[in-house]
Regions:
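Extended alpha-helical targeting/anchoring segments
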Residues: 2-527
């Protein structure tokens, strides 16, 4: 999610110089920007919202409507990052129907309306490309959403993934136009209404500015409206998940993967299972429960329209980015190896030392660092790919990981989209080498993975990108929550331990569903 930097230094102008309640840019400045042939211009207004919360603002602005989202980030140790992003409205959603590009809503003129939906993502960002306005937050508009694991077949020669039990579009990217950006450093809330040049002409400039201002006014009115109390207690409702694979079936997958590794077909293979539970709760309440219990670097709630006229929700707390592009720099953070957090500081330190001393964990992590370097070398300038942080311990609320940081500078002609394609999917979700590992996974699992192992995040109008790996995530659709988790299999893996690892990885999201089902507003009585 935007800006994992916890620095509280004031942002540069024009953001920091905005007077409270003032609309920027003025019509005069807006006209100057429009005549520079910008396809998108953010019109903004800064208000004080130190008594509000991101969840409360999302509730007021989104009103459970499709095309809305909430993005947040908690750093190591649970410290919340500077910005929280509320998506209040999307002009349209770029998705896929029967394998082809499909728009829900009215996209601007000149955007692709047929063909490969992943290429449509690339071409939409290119068509709406607009230089960043200095001083505004890192995300003020763009394509926000999810790309499933199964989209990899559009970029790699991988066999068909078997049955599709979720009916999930491979691409679902919302064209986010109206946002509210929390700046936790000063308690301000920046309301953003993007004026999109829908017809690619210089006409109707004043009308476009007036429309954006009216949308700011509407958001301000919605924020000012009284809201019912959401103070609650939680009495979790136990759920017994069903799985895509029985325990013996999963352990047979592990043995098959080990046999393939011994035969030299792969170094590592990530096999997974999908857990499903009823989900009577609202997705926002699932997010609230997950936010409290498992804060992570990538927290997200997205309500996405489906081509069939319904909507589905994605609720997650992913610890891991696939790729982030800022300016011309691409950054990835391979994560492999884990231990639970200790019961005391000394115990925690002991577990960290044990993790770093585990030869199997170190070997797996080194393999993934090499894979990340190879991926970046496909799209970065020679000599710029570097491992700037190697095998550091990163601590989260319930778990610690070994994490490294690999960076590189994009070559001329390469975009953030190209960086996404080069690194997709994460080696931590496939294994290595990727193409053969993915082919084996398809044979073992027998199902399309859907969201699991894909990405959730954004490509903005200025050409930047931030994509989290879709793990520790619940897909809520048709009254059920689906949570998938995997284990990286190597030659000496123990089947029953790998099964238990998947159960443990799925636990946080499943607990959040149970907690949300048992959320009771103060004063309510269970029926």
């Amino acid at each position: 999610v935007p800006d994992s930097n916890t620095s509280l230094a004031p942002a540069p102008a024009p953001h920091a110089d905005l007077a409270w309640g003032r609309t920027w840019p003025s019509l005069e400045v807006f006209t100057e920007l429009a005549l520079e042939h910008r396809r998108v211009i953010p019109v903004v207004r800064r208000v004080l919202a130190d008594a509000e919360t991101p969840v409360g603002v999302y509730r007021k602005l989104a009103k459970d409507a499709p095309g809305t989202f909430l993005l947040e980030s908690a750093e190591h140790g649970g410290v919340w990052s500077r910005y929280s992003i509320v998506g209040a409205r999307s002009a349209a959603t770029l998705t896929e129907r029967e394998g082809q590009t499909h728009w829900i809503g009215e996209p601007p003129v000149g955007l692709p309306t047929e063909g490969d939906p992943t290429e449509a993502v690339r071409d939409t960002v290119a068509a709406l490309a607009t230089p960043r306005i200095p001083g505004l937050p890192p995300l003020t508009g763009g394509l926000v959403g999810a790309i499933t694991y199964d989209a990899v077949r559009r970029w790699e020669k991988v066999p068909d993934g078997g049955r599709d039990e979720l009916d999930l579009p491979e691409v679902a990217m919302m064209l986010a136009t109206d946002l509210a950006v929390f700046d936790h450093s000063d308690g301000s809330l920046l309301l953003v209404a993007n004026a999109v040049n829908h017809d690619a002409t210089d006409e109707h400039i004043e009308d476009a500015w007036a429309d954006a201002v009216s949308r700011l006014d509407r958001m301000a009115d919605e924020l000012a409206a009284p809201a019912p109390s959401t103070v609650a207690t939680i009495d979790p409702v136990p759920n017994e998940p069903t799985s895509s694979h029985t325990r013996p079936e999963f352990e047979e997958m592990v043995e098959a993967a080990k046999e393939a590794i011994r035969a030299g077909e792969a170094f590592q293979i990530v096999v997974s299972q999908r857990f499903t539970v009823p989900c009577p709760a609202d997705a926002l309440d699932v997010y609230r429960a997950l936010r409290v219990s498992n804060p992570s670097p990538y927290m997200y709630l997205l309500r996405i329209p489906h081509p069939d006229g319904t909507a589905y929700d994605i609720v997650g707390s992913s610890p891991e980015a696939l790729i982030k592009v800022t300016g011309r720099q691409a950054i990835t953070h391979p994560i492999a190896g884990s231990r639970p957090r200790g019961k005391s500081p000394d115990h925690d330190a002991h577990l960290a030392e044990e993790l770093l001393g585990d030869a199997k964990e170190r070997a797996e992590h080194l393999m993934l660092v090499d894979l990340a370097r190879n991926d970046l070398q496909r799209i970065c300038r020679a000599g710029t790919v570097d491992t700037v942080d190697f095998m550091s311990i990163r601590r989260y609320s319930h778990i610690m990981h070994i994490e490294s940081t690999v960076v590189g500078d994009l070559r001329d002609g390469q975009s953030a989209y190209d960086a996404l394609v080069a690194t997709f999917p994460a080696g931590t979700l496939s294994g290595a080498p990727k193409p053969r590992a993915m082919a084996l996974i398809d044979g073992y699992e027998g199902l399309r993975r859907g969201l699991y192992g894909g990405v959730v995040g954004y490509l903005d109008f200025a050409g930047d990108l931030d994509m989290a790996i879709a793990i520790r995530t619940a897909l809520i659709k048709d009254g059920r929550a689906h949570v998938q988790a995997g284990a990286g299999i190597v030659a000496d893996s123990v089947p029953h331990l790998e099964y238990e690892e998947t159960v443990n990885k799925a636990a946080a999201a499943l607990r959040a569903v149970a907690a949300a089902a048992g959320l009771r507003l103060l004063g309510d009585r269970p029926t």
